[in-house]
Structures are given as C-alpha cells and as structure tokens.
Amino acid sequence: MSEQQPRVIESKEIMTLLPHRYPFLLVDRVLDFKEGEWLKAIKNISVNEPCFTGHFPGEPILPGVLILEALAQAMGILAFKTLELKGGELFYFAGIDEARFKRPVLPGDQMELNVQVIKERRGITAFTGVATVNGEIACEAKLMCARR
C-alpha cells in the first residue's frame, strides 16, 4: 500500500476560502488535511506583525487571542474543504473552552496549527485546537465555529 501525499493548500487558495486579509489572515499554508476530521497548517510569525507595536514594546509576544483566531481560521478552511463550499460563506467564532497558554509565541517562530473535529451539528462545529512551536505546545483549547 502506498503512502498518501500530503494535501497542501497555498496562501492563494486560502484567500479564496477565508474572507480575512492582512493583517488578519493568520494561516500561511495548510500542510495536510482530511475532510471532516483534521487539518495541519502553519503561520510564520514576523517581527513586522502589527500587534508587536504595542504587545509589548521591546518584548514582542503574539497575543493569545490571535493564536486562538489562527486556530479558528484553520478550522474554517477545514470546514470549507469538508463541505465543499465556495468562498462567500462565513464561519463565526462561537465559543472557547479550556484555553491554556503554555509558552509565548515570538517573532521568528513558526507556529503549527492543528485542529481536529469533535462534532458538527446544525452548522456548528466543535473542535480541538493545538498550536505548537518546535513541538512545544503554545496554546490548546476547545473551540466552536458557527456557519452562516
């Protein structure tokens, strides 16, 4: 049995799925995914991120809410691919439970975003999200997105 090739989604296609644009598009590339189950993506953290101007001057740290938003955007991409939707539909961040931040995300880091579907019902998707840097957990949470 042959090993399946990763299913990569580049930024140009991501922009056809998500309505977000600079400075709020927080997924650079999808490394692989399986419809209805999971997705792995990356976000490269640049010293030029607008949030670093004030968070914190001289000690830039990516705000936790942006890590959670990146996980939600990764889930949105998975939902579009799973439901074979075209751009134009929206997924709203609907809830966060058990969010934990375990290490800072800094300029120069590459953040890996891993999302896994827990359940989907009536347009609401519950999922787990884990953001890592160099294999270390930066953030983990249970999240929900609602389709409009």
From Swiss-Prot:
Source organism (scientific name): Haemophilus influenzae (strain PittEE)
Molecular function terms from GO: (3R)-hydroxyacyl-[acyl-carrier-protein] dehydratase activity
Swiss-Prot/TrEMBL catalytic activity: a (3R)-hydroxyacyl-[ACP] = a (2E)-enoyl-[ACP] + H2O
The EC number(s) this enzyme carries: 4.2.1.59
Function description: Involved in unsaturated fatty acids biosynthesis. Catalyzes the dehydration of short chain beta-hydroxyacyl-ACPs and long chain saturated and unsaturated beta-hydroxyacyl-ACPs.
Single GO biological process annotation from the record: fatty acid biosynthetic process
A Pfam family annotated for this UniProt entry: FabA
HAMAP family: FabZ
InterPro entries the UniProt entry points to: FabA_FabZ, FabZ, HotDog_dom_sf
Enzyme type, top EC level: lyase
Location in or out of the cell: Cytoplasm
Protein name as it appears in the record: 3-hydroxyacyl-[acyl-carrier-protein] dehydratase FabZ
Gene3D superfamilies, per the entry: Hotdog Thioesterase
